[in-house]
Amino acid sequence: MIFVDSSALLKRYIQEPGSDLVDRVMREDSHWAASVLARTESEITLCRRLSGTGLHVDRVRRLGDEWHYITAVPVDADCLLRARAIGCDFSIRTLDAIHLAAAQLIPGRPAF
């Protein structure tokens, strides 16, 4: 299983450095997971970065279509407590800590 955060997920919809790698890895393993936050964060970013291009509507729709193939990991109170510890211990941003805490809730050892 591959766990993707918002920055990896966005590389499927916006061509940028790392997009080819993300596409290849996600083709090689069809079991994907992400925190429920990843969809909201990705859709808002697509709208913000692609507004005025006319592409944001299509890309948000594609993300919604593909979201059905992603195991959505809930962000609950336990996840947020875990995120707080990760964020404080490793001095990382809040959203990154939440994504990492959600990844820890997946059974087994997902790839990142």
Question: Where do the PLM segments sit?
Answer:
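Hydrophobic side chains within alpha-helical segments
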Residues: 8, 44, 99-102
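Preference for short coil/turn "hinge" residues that link or interrupt alpha-helices
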Residues: 6-7, 15, 30, 66-68, ...
